Amino acid sequence: MKSCKATKIEAVLTMDSKGQILLPKELRERAGLKAGDRLVAIAGCDENEEVCCLILVKAELVDEEMRSIIAPMLKGVVG
């Protein structure tokens, strides 16, 4: 699995009335995303269990190693 070397703010997104967000074309191209690609949304929660951040990961990158890292976080969400 590739590891990220750096993070930065790429775009400010707006949600429409249908709950959809649009990733800017330049970002989609840089990420190699195309129509029909699947993304996994990982939610980070604060001490009050309020979602404070979302991370999007290409579904094909969610391998067993990543699942083992995510699993403990999901226990708190799904019980």
Swiss-Prot record:
Domain SpoVT-AbrB: 10-60
PROSITE patterns cross-referenced by the UniProt entry: SPOVT_ABRB
A Pfam family recorded for this sequence: MazE_antitoxin
Taxonomic superkingdom: Archaea
Keyword line: DNA-binding
Single GO MF descriptor: DNA binding
Protein name as catalogued: Uncharacterized protein AF_0476
Record organism: Archaeoglobus fulgidus (strain ATCC 49558 / DSM 4304 / JCM 9628 / NBRC 100126 / VC-16)
